[in-house]
Amino acid sequence: MASQDVQTAARTIIVASLNPVKIAATVQGFSEMFPGSAFTSRGVSVPSGVPDQPLGDAETLQGALNRAQRAREIEPDADFWVGLEGGVLEEAGVAGSPKLVQSFAWIVVIGRSRTGKARTAAYYLPEETAKLVRDGMELGPAEDIVWGKSNTKQTNGSVGLLTGDVINRKGYYVQAVVLALIPFKNPVLTFS
């Protein structure tokens, strides 16, 4: 069943990022969820309204939502606006040990009549990276230092480095984009 937001004519997706990995993951997620549909996409640079390295679920989700909303404000004639925001979550470790740090991302898809949201899986960062993040560094630059690489957030990302590219950053985001599109795939159902 085709949804009210995804039709047969080419639909325009605005991704609230200029990061080629985020744009490619978004397009792939839409294409997988709606295989008979045509999409055009472009990225725009918009502020997230949250710190450069969001901490916790609420702040990260707010960053993704802010990005999607701001993309809609500057490109109002599109059909979909997508915000992707990576975040970290600190949790208490064993007494006397440093806090553990998880990495994850939120994806928000705004359409003309509904909004979808999904969170990626989470994974723990190694202490070498976690210490830099706890000290205020963004995850991407922290991983670049730990791994001796540059600009990994626009290639395989932290998840790709840690899994040996079994899961790269694009693949990591694609699944969450698909999950954020559930309300659009099921237009007769109600999602809050």
Regions from the PLM with identified roles:
Residues 2-78:
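N-terminal polybasic phosphate/anion-binding patch
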Residues 52-192:
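Anionic-ligand binding patches
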